[in-house]
From Swiss-Prot:
Pfam families: Fumarate_red_C. The gene is frdC. Gene3D superfamilies: Fumarate reductase/succinate dehydrogenase, transmembrane subunit. Belongs to the FrdC family. The lineage of its organism: Bacteria, Pseudomonadati, Pseudomonadota, Gammaproteobacteria, Vibrionales. GO terms for molecular function: succinate dehydrogenase activity. One of its GO terms (cellular component) is plasma membrane. The chain crosses the membrane at residues 30-50, 67-87, 107-127. This is Fumarate reductase subunit C. HAMAP family: Fumarate_red_C (MF_00708). It comes from Aliivibrio salmonicida (strain LFI1238). The keyword Cell membrane applies. It is found in: Cell inner membrane. It comes from the Bacteria. InterPro entries: Fumarate_red_C (IPR003510), SQR/QFR_C/D (IPR034804).
Length: 127
């Protein structure tokens, strides 16, 4: 066994800011933070619904707060950004072939957004 110390290159905590690819990756992964807030709000709302009309009205008042509305808009934007990056990655990771030919990437991405729009419309009509 050697007594030599292995070379360990020092890295700053902000090393990723110097590389556009990693900066984009970190922004994409950071979109989870507003979604965590949104999920917690929904869970608290579910608990308020179980507790009764007074708790439900209190939760509705909380959700009507302009800061909460702004955070929910940020969560929606983050969710759409995350979906866009996922949808644009999908044809590269799993190319779809029909009749021996690979479908155009734009067709696959547009089909995914069409499915999102159709499901959203269906949920809005049902609820």
């Amino acid at each position: 066994m050697s007594n030599r110390k292995p070379y360990v290159r020092e890295m700053t905590r902000t090393w990723w800011k110097d590389h556009p690819f990693y900066r984009f990756y970190m922004v994409r992964e950071a979109t989870i933070l507003p979604l965590i807030f949104f999920t917690i709000c929904l869970l608290v709302g579910l608990g308020s619904l179980v507790k009764g009309p007074l708790a439900w009205a209190s939760w509705l008042d909380f959700m009507a707060n302009p800061i909460v509305v702004a955070l929910n808009i940020v969560a929606l934007a983050g969710s759409l950004f995350h979906a866009q990056t996922f949808f644009s990655m999908m044809p590269q990771v799993m190319p779809i072939r029909l009749g021996g030919k690979t479908l155009d990437k734009k067709v696959v991405v547009l089909a995914q957004w069409a499915a999102v729009a159709a499901i959203t419309l269906l949920v809005l009509v049902i609820v």
